[in-house]
Amino acid sequence: MNLPEKWQGKDVIMKNSKYTFKITTIGILTGLSVVLVFLVRFPIFPAAPFLEYDPADIPILLAAFAFGPIAGITSTIIASIIQGITVSSHSGIYGIIMHILSTGSYVLVAGLIYRAKRDRFGGCFGLLVGVVVSAIVMAIANLIITPLFMGVPVEAVKQMLIPVVIPFNLLKSGINGVIVFAIYKPISNYFIKSIDLRKS
């Protein structure tokens, strides 16, 4: 059964409005991720001051929860490139790759689990699994990529994994996950209301 022409027109306008809202919001969250790196950066472990905490994953995780894991991955890649040529330019392509692997694995896993179970348990479980997966990915990445780009012996990297690298990634991702879990529902209500307003 075909819809009346005027209804079809409204349906197209509604879809375009939702798409515009989605793209705009993802863009804003991606930009916010970059800004947060400029504003908040500090080392967690004195023995490894080059490993800095930043809250940049928070807006990207929000994008993944609100619009799906593909949106989170897209936001991750864009934010990583921008950060890699601005605030983190000293780390170059190495920093961009490591950022994409760390945040990308986190938001992909968390976003996929939350998409399958869109409630508080799904959000909590997705973030928890994402933290663990991201830490594992970064442990492997440090063993393979760090020696290639930084000229650090593999044995030296191995010695840093358990006391520094793995705890750092667990702590950083865990902090960001707790914040996302605390703020996502109020923010998601705003997303829903904004979309509903565009229907009227």
Q: What kind of region is each of these model predictions?
A:
Residues 1-200:
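Loop-helix junctions at membrane interfaces
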